[in-house]
Amino acid sequence: IPSNNLGKGLQNDTVKAYIYKRNRSNKQEADIVEIIERDKTSFVGVLQLSKNFGFVVADDFKMYTDIFVAKNKLKDAEDGVKVLVKITDWPANSKTPFGEILEILGMPGDHETEIHSILLEYGLPYKFPENVEAEAGLIPLTISQNEIDKRRDMRNETTFTIDPKDAKDFDDALSFKVLENGNYEIGIHIADVSHYVEEKTNLEEEAYNRATSVYLVDRVVPMLPEVLSNGVCSLRPNEEKLTFSSIFEINNKAHVVNEWFGRTVIYSDKRFAYEEAQEIIETKGNTISEEISITGESYTVQPEIVTAILTLQELAKKLRKKRLQQGAITFDRVEVKFNLDENAEPVGVFFKESKDANKLIEEFMLLANRKVAEFIGSKKGVETKNTFIYRVHDEPNLDKLMALQSIVSKFGYSNKIDLKNKQTTSSSLNKLLEDVHGKGESNMIETLAVRSMSKAVYTTQNIGHYG
């Protein structure tokens, strides 16, 4: 479609087009003859002000035209500021659309201005509607005895959370108990959001529209208002919380002997950062040093929690070993993180490495997910009540694996990927990733290996999970 035939169509609009062949060529061209539905009408951009009007130059490079704003629609915005503008009309005889300024964001380059620009550009609302906030404000902050009586009471079990040091909300927790027979009772708990967010409410509709929380470098755009995300649904220490739990009896070989799934009430004894839990694992001691402590002061951890972390670490290693033997593929990609000053400006960069404390949490979350899927998947019949959404990974793309083989051979890793069957493919991939670990080419090869995998899909069809 040539630029002069766009017919006022913008990126991702639904349009009606007249298709024809070019003269002296079999190539097809099209004219857009009707805009059926606009995908987007609001844009972030910089205002260029004249005496009686202004133009907004959009940040989105795919927005090929400026937006004209009449003087009475400028909202007293000054020249050169970033604004949010909405297209209100596009007269037939005008080359540019007409619009009005909805919001003045600030000066380009300013941290808060740019963050809000990103949020608005991608349609990520950082404010909740008043009716949603009002509904959230009615949620009780205490738990009734009547609700506790309906649940399995886990408040007396040793329980803790391990999260990034800058985390504001704590979604999951682990509990630990040694049973009389020598086995371990391990609970994996997540906040029971469904208790607070009921169907056909403003809260549920807003959460549905947002779909997920969005994590930026210096903040989170939550799916739920703060009273939920950082309050009643955050498993903060020294507070009773409603949770949904997977509870396993596990022996010292990391074999699951018994399992239970259901609603619980817990009481977290302690909140750890990954670095603090890692220090316990490495030193096998109960002292968190001043340099590692998120409080900035050295402190002592209760002996029962130290025992729990060290035992869970040994079980996690055994669970991981079993997964790899069964064909799981493990990617330890380096993640780049930023150090921010008090104004949220980046002052440094570092590489985030996944250590034993991270892998401990990962293993038990994987165990809970896998066992829940197996439990539901083993139910017979096709009744609607047993319908379940699975996260599945199809087999990797063979062409991409062969391309990966070709690339790694140039680094001296010839014949490293054995494509004979699923087991040989996964085991040889793991061996390759192990061989490249810590080398200059490791991040590139791991990235290519990840891209050769099929993307995760959420479906009611349980086709299995590769790796």
Roles of regions detected by a PLM:
Residues I1-T161, K165-A173, L179, N183-G187, ...:
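S1/OB-fold single-stranded RNA-binding interface
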Residues L84, W90-P91, S117-L124, N131-G467:
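Electropositive polyanion-binding surfaces
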